[in-house]
Amino acid sequence: MLEELFRLDGKVIVVTGATGLLGRKHAEAIACYGGTPILLDLSQQAVDNFANELNAKYKGSSVGFSVDITNEKAIKNNAKLIIGRFGKIDGLVNNAANNPKVEDSKEVNFSRLENFPLDIWHDDIAVGLTGAFLCIKHYGFMISKNPNGGSIVNISSDLGLIAPDQRLYKKDGISKDKQNVKPVTYSVVKTGLIGLTRYLATYWADKNVRCNAMCPGGVKNGQPEDFLKEVSVRIPMARMAYSDEYQGTLLWMLSDASTYLNGAIIPVEGGRTAW
């Protein structure tokens, strides 16, 4: 039956940043459609609580691990634990990333490129890009050993396809050199994930491992009304996304409904990048 193509029964899928706003939605979609989400985040208590919540609701066997994805040894050991417990890994959702926000002072706005701290640059790249690489190196390699391969989904952004419109953050009465901006690392990380996706799409294709990127737009999550209004006029659908609006796309990308999808960069952003 056609609807069965979207099912994830028996599939073991690693989700990084699993207790964040979208990470929770990704994991919930996997569990709802019969898969076993392996929840990775920094807090063991948070992933344990979320795993218990998912298992109670969907009668699954989700499990959580505290893993720093910038630590290769931790990832390598965790991959062995997962294989020891479940025997395989079928999918990976590279979702973890810093949300780069830099505290400003009265004298200097550190979000601006000319003032951006090098240590924050290194940290953002380490989590969002190096972390994704390390997860692919170890979890993805395990996927490549499956007889039927599997699926890797990198969570990029509409801002991996277009530049951030810094006018959204402009405030009256503040000089240009003090205005807030979307930090440079966000664009670098999200664009880098697109390049990584294309590389992987050709690297393990002979082992039936597909790699694709989703480029979600911004999610409505308590932003000020004036900001929501400014963003909305830049989106053909005239609104930001709801947090559950990416679940269907993710299920399609992970499931057998998309077995010929490979190397695709899929915008899910209300049409923003079409303008």
Residue ranges of each PLM-predicted region?
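A conserved structural motif in NAD(P)-dependent oxidoreductases
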Residues: 235-246, 257
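Catalytic Tyr-X3-Lys loop
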Residues: 90, 110-133, 153, 186-188, ...
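Short C-terminal tail/terminal secondary-structure segment
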Residues: 2-5, 110, 174, 251, ...
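Catalytic loop of short-chain dehydrogenase/reductase
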Residues: 114-118, 153-192, 197-206
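Canonical Rossmann dinucleotide-binding motif of NAD(H)/NADP(H)-dependent dehydrogenases/reductases
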Residues: 5-38, 200
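Conserved glycine-rich Rossmann-like NAD(P)H-binding loop of the short-chain dehydrogenase/reductase
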Residues: 33-49
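Short, small/polar-rich loop/turn modules that mediate ligand/substrate recognition or access, typified
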Residues: 205-210, 261-263
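Amphipathic alpha-helical dimer-interface segment in Rossmann-like NAD(P)H-dependent oxidoreductases
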Residues: 80, 97, 118, 123-147, ...
